[in-house]
Amino acid sequence: MSPLTRRRLVGLAAFGGLGVLAGCSTSDPLQSSAPAPGTAAPGTTAAGGGTLVVGSQQYYSNEIIAELYAQAIEGAGYTVERQYQIGQREVYLPELEAATIDVLPEYSGNLLQYYDKAATATDPAGVTAALETALPAGLRVLAAAEASDQDSYTVTKAFADEHGLTAIGDLTKAPQPVRLAANSEFAIRPYGPEGAKATYGVDIELVPVEDSGGPLTARALKDGTVQVADLYTADPTIAKEGFVILEDPEGLILPQNVIPIVSEKVDATAAAAIEAVNAKLTVAELQALNARSVDEQARSADIAKDWLSQQGLA
């Protein structure tokens, strides 16, 4: 068993004590969609610039972004090893710190709060600036994309209409506690149950659903298993199902712009290739990429290859 696999299992086991609503789903957008680790994606070659390991969270959209970076790096002459669907921050950030992974797409606000729980920055530029001093030695972030994909407190339109909900604080109008579907680590996030109670006076009962805001989480919301779900804002399911994202006037959830976190092995040439991707990655573009995965069940490698070609980056 490799060190990465061993650490991954330990990290996942840390949340094993919570009851979990999870299981296999045929609608998992990216199940086994990535090229094998150490192989180039279709239509790309890898040679000449050394080897970089690109990782992704256990989240289909994050894998798509990771594959964009991977293919862009390969196009710049590097060999890429892929380590996708690793897990959440408690698992993969130690791997980055140990230089087992060299590149991983992150989300600015959540990354900042992982390293600095007392962070006070609330706007995108301030969050990015704060990250530059919050990260441990050996890690740095590159330029953030315009695209963001934020955690959210999302409800069905029927539930919003029934209780007159437009903002997170309005959840106090509904019977307490409110059941919320999210990954189990939501329990310890600053915007989780404790944050919702302290900021808005809302009592949250977490129902763990381990698919990172994916189809199981959406299904739990739609069928009434829960009243609220942590769906990510670039998910096309929100618009398709007519779900309502509750406003967050107090800034409980920080801006979550897509931002690459990289090791010291990422040189100027590789960094430029990654930043060229981020320069083109808008909110609309990310939503379109995600829609191809959800609606077409397209592989991350194919989605990335097509998009890079369309953007003149291939």
Residue ranges and their predicted role:
Residues 115-142, 225-228, 237-250:
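Ligand-binding "clamshell"
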Residues 25-47:
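Short, low-complexity, disordered segments immediately C-terminal to signal peptides
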Residues 1-16:
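N-terminal secretory signal peptides and thylakoid transit peptides that target proteins
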Residues 124-180, 279-283:
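A conserved helix-loop-strand patch within extracytoplasmic ligand-binding domains
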Residues 48-61, 80-83, 176-181:
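Short, well-ordered beta-strand elements
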Residues 151-161, 256-269:
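A bilobed periplasmic-binding-protein/Venus flytrap-type ligand-binding module shared by bacterial periplasmic
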Residues 20-23:
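C-terminal motif of bacterial Sec signal peptides marking the signal peptidase cleavage site
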Residues 177-248:
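Ligand-binding pocket segment of bilobal, Venus flytrap-like solute-binding proteins
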